[in-house]
């Protein structure tokens, strides 16, 4: 999120941990990543970056919603996807009107786009049941796995060897291409003379 703000986008970072939100609002990164705190501070000062624990506010005020949560391994070796499920359900419960692209960046098994869509729809149904009102939620899901190394995540984000996008929706893919244009065109790359980043 911080790197997308650095490319000029308006970004709302949502975390359910109030202590982390307070830390991020103070300009401190909750993880060790060289240069991250400085990027957070400069983009918050430029009003391109906001931190909150209010998921509904983040959903309402965004066109593209990223699910970027941990998926620690279970004893079986499979990914623990409960945090992805909780966020997807929360997004569904917060959707109102207007088209949204929901992007899963978390490490999940291949084919999880349909699963994320189902969980979001469950969240929509729960909200509809609670409120008794019709909810016209329009959204598509994009899988966008990240290939970041701890300690060099900022460099890796701005200098990828490829960007991987998967979706059944061309509209969603077009929005993602537009979002990533500064990175694709190497505008924030260390070596700006390199050819455009391939999108696969």
Region locations from a protein language model:
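Structural/interface elements that position substrates and couple domains in central-metabolism enzymes
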Residues: 1-200
């Amino acid at each position: 999120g911080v790197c997308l703000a650095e490319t000029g986008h308006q970004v709302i970072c949502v975390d359910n941990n109030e202590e982390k939100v307070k830390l991020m609002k103070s300009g401190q990164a909750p993880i060790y990543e060289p240069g991250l705190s400085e990027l957070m501070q400069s983009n918050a000062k430029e009003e391109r970056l906001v931190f909150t624990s209010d998921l509904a506010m983040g959903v309402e005020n965004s066109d593209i919603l990223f699910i970027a949560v941990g998926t620690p391994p279970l004893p079986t070796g499979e990914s623990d996807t409960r945090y992805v499920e909780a966020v997807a359900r929360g997004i569904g419960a917060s959707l109102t009107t207007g088209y949204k692209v929901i992007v899963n960046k978390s490490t999940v098994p291949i084919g999880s786009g349909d699963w994320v869509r189902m969980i979001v729809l469950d969240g929509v149904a729960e909200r509809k049941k609670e409120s008794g009102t019709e909810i016209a939620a329009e959204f598509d899901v994009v899988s966008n796995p990240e290939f970041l190394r701890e300690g060099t995540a900022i460099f890796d984000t701005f200098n990828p060897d490829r960007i991987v996008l998967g979706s059944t929706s061309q509209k969603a893919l077009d929005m993602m291409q537009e979002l990533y244009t500064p990175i694709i065109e190497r505008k924030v790359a260390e070596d700006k003379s390199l050819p455009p980043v391939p999108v696969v």
